Amino acid sequence: MSFFAGKLNNKSILSLRRGSGGDTNQHINPDSQTIFHSDMSHVIITETHSTGLRLDQGAGDYYWSEMPSRVTQLHNNDPNRVVLTEIEFSDGSRHMLSGMSMGVGAKAYGIINPQIMSQGGLKTQITASADLSLDVGYFNTGTSGTIPQKLRDGTGCQHMFGAFSGRRGFASSAMYLGGAALYKSAWSGSGYVVADAGTLTIPSDYVRHPGARNFGFNAIYVRGRSCNRVLYGMEGPNYTTGGAVQGASSSGALNFTYNPSNPESPKYSVGFARADPTNYAYWESMGDPNDSANGPIGIYSEHLGIYPSKITWYVTNLVYNGSGYNIDGGLFNGNDIKLSPREFIIKGVNVNNTSWKFINFIEKNFNVGNRADFRDVGCNLSKDSPSTGISGIATFGLPTTESNNAPSIKGGNVGGLHANVVSIYNFLPSASWYVSSNPPKIGNNYGDVWSENLLPLRLLGGSGSTILSGNIVFQGNGSVHVGTVGLDLNSSRNGAIVCTMEFIDDTWLSAGGIGCFNPTEMLSQGAEYGDSRFRIGGNTINKKLHQILSLPAGEYVPFFTIKGTVVNACKLQAAAYNPTPYWVSGLPGSVGQTGYYTLTYYMRNDGNNNISIWLDSSMSNIIGMKACLPNIKLIIQRLT
């Protein structure tokens, strides 16, 4: 029999299982065929908080709101609590935040004969978002200025790194020395770079990760766009004589340094700052950003065709413990069991009168329809291969559900995607209940609530984890396997998981591909192996992103994407940086040799009880893509 309500082995049980027939005793304990069981550690929503978004004058397209006080308290003081964040848009569609994205721009610039005249340098700018497809971040309303200016000290900032030498002879040497000071290593035995005592180390608390929890943020912003991709023109960082970058956060750092053992050696400056995400003039001479030869910079993000209007936070009873998850408090601790048209009591809890909400896993291609008690929310994408299918500029659409609960995808240019949803079930006092054994289901006058297609999430089995760390070099477009998590997933069915991306340190900034490595290190000079990342000191900031994901069997779910642009730049026609930056194929030549790339991390339900992790590289006009894995501890536990 597929349904039981009563007592077995002297304990109260309500149980719904797949199949029909069989011994009543199979309901005593839940197993892999269980749909609902009153003894299971079900995942529920204990609190719901909502606020509308507004758009201030001068805020561009940065919609924002202060977070409710309870959400602010959880965000800053309870970083292990799994809180789901839903964004509702002007057309009624909905999206649940998941994953992370970065935008990276990098440039090396100089002239064909740097021993004679002009400038040289290198520069990187990084933005990041607390969602794979949408630009989302946190800030403090107490910061001065407009909303974009407030983001200089929030997670919506741009992190700016640069090394620069002015109009003087032998600028080439200064470029090399500046690169050595800014990055962790320089060429080995190349004859160009020597060890230098002047180095720039960025303190960890200068960095604003999208999952940062220690800065007292009390507000959130959302754009109807993807995370910024930074497109560079030809000029270089323009430092002021006062030793600070104009328009940047006061928390920035700027070092003017040189080789102290040789005062006559070429001088150079090395800098870091956080800045407004919408105004990049402070490190560039401004002009037409669409002029590839002389334009200073472009800020490009893909509009998804919708505008955010409301945010809802769902506080769950799931708590991350560093190696897995716990359920906070018991759900059903009484004895009474009753299921009748007007009453639904599970071990003393009358669910019709509770404020709890259950979270259901919905099978792929199943739609509950437009119902008052179900609120489906698009949570993640999936596809048949770990590849964007796009060379260079790839953008993932936004998984949403429409106001009638139908799944959809907004914007993007990556094809072959499926939108997956999580379903929020709200018990209504007006519900009239029924139960069926064949097929097994519990429902009410609004429709089925729990069935083989509608599984209430519950914490199952042990957790699994892997750490994504190290260097990878791609010689062309392709995907590589970077990790496996064993979870004892049911091999024949789709599943749902809870997943935490815990960033062990701030080397995630170096995960931005070639844009985050020293551009004066050519591939032929050993850049395949050299550790040439930014120096970040300390790890004082808690950085976690929690999400619930749907994993269709055999499909790949993107959870972290990096969009990059690199430019080999010079202001003079028919001149180029010398030597050639390591990402460029060939000798110096044309102005503005620009390359584009997208790095994407996927997880796959392998159908053999494992989840595999993949990294895909998509490049255009780039050779030798060098990537640093972001030093993420990825913790996953089954919910179905």
UniProtKB/Swiss-Prot annotation:
Residues 571-580 are annotated as: Interaction with host FhuA. The keyword Cell division does not apply. GO terms for biological process: entry receptor-mediated virion attachment to host cell; receptor-mediated virion attachment to host cell; symbiont entry into host cell. GO terms for cellular component: virus tail. Keywords: Host-virus interaction, Late protein, Viral attachment to host cell, Viral attachment to host entry receptor, Viral tail protein, Virion, Virus entry into host cell. The record marks 166 as: Interaction with host FhuA receptor. It is found in: Virion. Monomer. Interacts with straight fiber protein pb4. Interacts with the host FhuA receptor; this interaction is necessary for the entry of the viral genome into the host cell. Only small regions of the protein may be involved in protein-protein interactions in the tail structure, the major part being used in receptor binding. Structural component of the distal part of the tail. Mediates T5 irreversible binding to its host entry receptor, the E.coli outer membrane ferrichrome transporter FhuA protein. Upon binding to host FhuA, pb5 undergoes conformational changes that are probably the key to the transmission of the signal through the tail to the capsid, triggering DNA release. This is Receptor-binding protein pb5. It comes from Escherichia phage T5 (Enterobacteria phage T5). The lineage of its organism: Viruses, Duplodnaviria, Heunggongvirae, Uroviricota, Caudoviricetes.
